[in-house]
Amino acid sequence: MVVDFKIKRAPAYRVASVSWKGPWNERRIRAQFDRVAKWARKTGLRTGKWIFREPGTRAWEVSIEVRGSAHSEGPIRMRMLPATSVASVVFDPNVVSPAVVYHGVTDWLRWRKRDKTIRSVGAYREVYDGDPWREPKVWAHTEVQVVVRK
């Protein structure tokens, strides 16, 4: 499998999201994604990309892109993730270790900063085309995006 890094323009996403602080817990991440997906189904919204972010130290956010009219309700907040330039890499976690991919993209971005292709690096996020736990094809097409400033 080829793992290739590229800089591209990511579209704006209108998302329903839940955020919290605490230690890394994959079971909690999955439960929060399920909570947002259940809310979207109950509200009658069509869903798109599933986005997982770490906006701060030990701070986590799960978001699902929604299409349709909705308002925040309880812990679920409606947000707009703006269109931005990102460094992107698509890979299959069953073939290539995510630790290797994250290390590789970090080094690749360090060199892009040195050769002045980019000015700064922002937050990392994982973007899926659907539910990565229930759909193996979605899991095999994991995309890691890193917000960059040119």
Q: Where are the predicted features?
A:
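A solvent-exposed interaction/effector surface
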Residues: 1-150
